[in-house]
């Protein structure tokens, strides 16, 4: 993959427009998780230290285009950056006709989605953004799967278009995990539905040595294995797909192991009583919410022998502690492994935080949808345009 990197360019006195993913959760004007902001800071500091005139843009939430709303403002983000950089960062609301920025100064543009044409990748908007800068830096892996004016269009028209350190790092880590992995390659895919991750499972079943499924996804595989899943969340219409995927994995000398024991309850609530039982004893009124210790132990052994681990999704309803032991054991096994490990997806990152293993994972991806699309083997539009511009 050949793309120009920000680190290779001389940025002194250059107008540098950086697209970051600063889409953080904000409640009552307060940021509740700063993970994406922390991930973006090294890029911003590098550009500032290089003496660039730095402009930063991002979306936040899903406002109606052309209708600015205070709850979607990047003001809390701007305040956070001011504190983190120990420097007064300006929030600029009218920027499309030009902005005065001094060398060594950083400003933040108000929510890019307040502009008409952002989502549709409108050329007029993209050209206006491109005219603001000498160098466009795409650094938002989390939005790289979307062709929008601020991720794709601007890269088409900017004088120079390159990848920032965060995006470059994501692509290198994912490439290391999927293109030329140390074997055995183990992928752990959790989540509620097979349908939302079918293409991911399809793609991975052909390249991994072991595909571990968890959460609601596992229930469909349990049903495909001939067991009763009671009232569990599962997709009856995808049982045949689950059978096909298992056969596909086996044809590739891999496997998709089905849990031997599970943790069940008769209601979905924080106070539900958890019961451990063999997978073939689930009754009609029960729901599966976690894997049992026997299954967790077997998966721990698979993880311990891995050369590369890709983790996307918890294996149980870990938000409730009585159904969190499976995810906790898996998380700890990944943390204890010497394999190259990469974790991505919102729920996965929440589990990484809960069990405090962030420093034990080789690479934590900031992307949700982009991470999944990369796993599916899809081209990311915002990366593709950078490749074209590098030629």
UniProtKB/Swiss-Prot annotation:
Pathway: Carbohydrate degradation; glycolysis; pyruvate from D-glyceraldehyde 3-phosphate: step 2/5. One of its GO terms (biological process) is glycolytic process. Its EC number is 2.7.2.3. Pfam families: PGK. This is Phosphoglycerate kinase. The keyword Iron-sulfur does not apply. It is found in: Cytoplasm. InterPro entries: Phosphoglycerate_kinase (IPR001576), Phosphoglycerate_kinase_CS (IPR015911), Phosphoglycerate_kinase_N (IPR015824), Phosphoglycerate_kinase_sf (IPR036043). It catalyses: (2R)-3-phosphoglycerate + ATP = (2R)-3-phospho-glyceroyl phosphate + ADP. SUPFAM superfamilies: Phosphoglycerate kinase. GO terms for cellular component: cytosol. Substrate binds at residues 21-23, 36, 59-62, 113, 146. It comes from the Bacteria. One of its GO terms (molecular function) is ATP binding. Belongs to the phosphoglycerate kinase family. It is an enzyme of class 2 (transferase). Keywords: ATP-binding, Cytoplasm, Glycolysis, Kinase, Nucleotide-binding, Transferase. ATP binds at residues 197, 319, 345-348. The keyword Kinase applies. Monomer.
């Amino acid at each position: 993959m050949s793309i120009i990197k920000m680190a290779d360019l001389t940025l002194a006195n250059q107008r540098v427009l950086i697209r970051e993913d600063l889409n953080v959760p904000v409640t009552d004007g307060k940021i509740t998780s700063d993970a994406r902001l922390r991930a973006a800071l090294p890029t911003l500091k590098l550009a500032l230290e290089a003496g660039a005139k730095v402009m930063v843009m991002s979306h936040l939430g899903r406002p109606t285009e052309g209708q600015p709303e205070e709850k979607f403002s990047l003001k809390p983000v701007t305040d956070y950056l001011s504190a983190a950089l120990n420097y007064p960062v300006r929030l600029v609301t009218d920027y499309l006709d030009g902005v005065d920025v001094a060398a060594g100064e950083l400003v933040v543009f108000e929510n890019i989605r307040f502009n008409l044409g952002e989502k549709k990748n409108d050329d007029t908007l993209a050209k206006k953004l491109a005219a603001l800068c000498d160098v466009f830096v795409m650094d938002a892996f989390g939005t790289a799967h979307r062709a929008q004016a601020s991720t794709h269009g601007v890269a088409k028209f900017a004088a120079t278009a390159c990848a920032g350190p965060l995006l470059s790092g994501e692509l290198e880590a994912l490439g290391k995990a999927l293109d030329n992995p140390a074997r055995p390659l183990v992928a752990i895919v959790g989540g509620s539905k097979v349908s939302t991750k079918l293409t991911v499972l399809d793609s991975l079943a052909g390249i991994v040595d072991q595909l571990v499924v968890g959460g609601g996804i596992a229930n469909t595989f349990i049903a495909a294995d001939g067991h009763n899943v009671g009232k569990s969340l599962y997709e009856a219409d995808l049982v045949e797909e689950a059978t096909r995927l298992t056969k596909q994995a086996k044809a590739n000398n891999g496997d998709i192991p089905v849990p031997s024991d599970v943790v069940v309850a008769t209601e979905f609530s924080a106070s539900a009583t958890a019961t451990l039982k063999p997978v073939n004893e689930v009754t009609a009124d029960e729901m599966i919410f976690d894997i049992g210790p026997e299954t967790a132990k077997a998966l721990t052994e698979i993880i311990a022998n891995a050369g590369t681990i890709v983790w996307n999704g918890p294996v149980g309803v870990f938000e409730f502690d009585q159904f969190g032991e499976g995810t906790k054991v898996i998380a700890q096994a990944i943390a204890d492994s010497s394999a190259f490990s990469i974790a991505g997806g919102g729920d996965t990152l929440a589990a990484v935080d809960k069990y405090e293993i962030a420093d034990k994972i080789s690479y934590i991806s900031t992307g949700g949808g982009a991470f999944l699309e990369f796993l599916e083997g899809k081209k990311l539009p915002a990366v593709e345009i950078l490749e074209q511009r590098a030629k």
